[in-house]
């Protein structure tokens, strides 16, 4: 498709959408868009501050690599809210009149690129974090010697560049991103699918997203099973496993949030790609799936805000007090210190220790 012909879909799509647009309340949609954008930006900003502070405090390799990837994920969510939310509010404020403010289809293309990138990149980073933790738990020697912060930064850059490449594929193939039926967002062509290329972009996007979720699930399952086996087999290195446990809990929460939020949208896009113009998917269904996917960028930062040792410890104490249970300062992250205390007590009660104490007291008497 030539560049001149690529400019035509903006106006033609807008004309077709005029008859198939979703019936949405403009004022209510503007209000919710502003609320979602504000909450997302504030939440991700708070999570970025927490992760950066944790990265400065924990310089150990096993923690630093995870925190770098987590920071990249939250920063991606932050800019996704900032760009996508800002464009959406502008579209609503302009009464969704794309022909008037975007005749050249530039804004729609930017919107579509940002939608694809901010959708796939967090999923890719989530699977990368799961792989990193799986290696750290199953092969700690290789992780500590081969996976450095420099390597993690290179991997982070590579993941982001691949997500950018996927987002730019339609532009490189001289295809425009299309205004969707609700006239509030832009994405791949989901209406009036003409050829295999339209189906390819939708299937490629859905396949990559579902693959990332599958990798996260597999790696987290292996990590969890390994930690359980080590726990029952040996009681050494509790403190090291406590860091693994905290990060795995966060990974499981991210995976659950991503699956719940993104699966409907990914399956919907795959359904449209497979069935084409005969797809039973309605505009309202697609818009609902999109809004669920948007919630992923809001919930992701709260995983790092809430699922921290200090917060969980306080929540545990609060819940126990509310239930009327007497609390002993005992939780999973303090087992190592208790074990060390027991070891010290056992050594102090041994005969050798008693002799040393008697010699020390006699010398003190002299």
Curated annotation (Swiss-Prot):
Function: Receptor for prostaglandin F2-alpha (PGF2-alpha). The activity of this receptor is mediated by G proteins which activate a phosphatidylinositol-calcium second messenger system. Initiates luteolysis in the corpus luteum.
Main location: membrane
Disulfide bonds: 108-186
Subcellular compartments: Cell membrane
Top-rank lineage group of the source organism: Eukaryota
Name of the protein in question: Prostaglandin F2-alpha receptor
GO molecular function, one term: prostaglandin F receptor activity
Keyword flag Isomerase: no
Transmembrane in keyword set: yes
GO CC, one annotated term: extracellular region
Species of origin: Rattus norvegicus
Membrane topology: Multi-pass membrane protein
Key words, A-Z: Cell membrane, Disulfide bond, G-protein coupled receptor, Glycoprotein, Membrane, Receptor, Transducer, Transmembrane, Transmembrane helix
Pfam family for this entry, one: 7tm_1
TM ranges: 32-55, 70-90, 110-131, 153-175, 199-224, 251-267, 286-307
InterPro entries, A to Z: GPCR_Rhodpsn, GPCR_Rhodpsn_7TM, PglndnF_rcpt, Prostanoid_rcpt
BP-aspect Gene Ontology terms: adenylate cyclase-activating G protein-coupled receptor signaling pathway; cellular response to prostaglandin D stimulus; inflammatory response; negative regulation of apoptotic process; positive regulation of cell population proliferation; positive regulation of cytosolic calcium ion concentration; positive regulation of gene expression; response to estradiol
Membrane side Cytoplasmic: residue ranges: 56-69, 132-152, 225-250, 308-366
Ranges facing Extracellular side: 1-31, 91-109, 176-198, 268-285
Protein family (similarity comment): Belongs to the G-protein coupled receptor 1 family.
Tissue specificity remark: Highest expression in pregnant ovary. Also found in a low extent in the kidney. In the brain, expressed in astrocytes and oligodendrocytes, and meningeal fibroblasts, but not in migroglia cells.
Annotated glycan sites: 4, 19
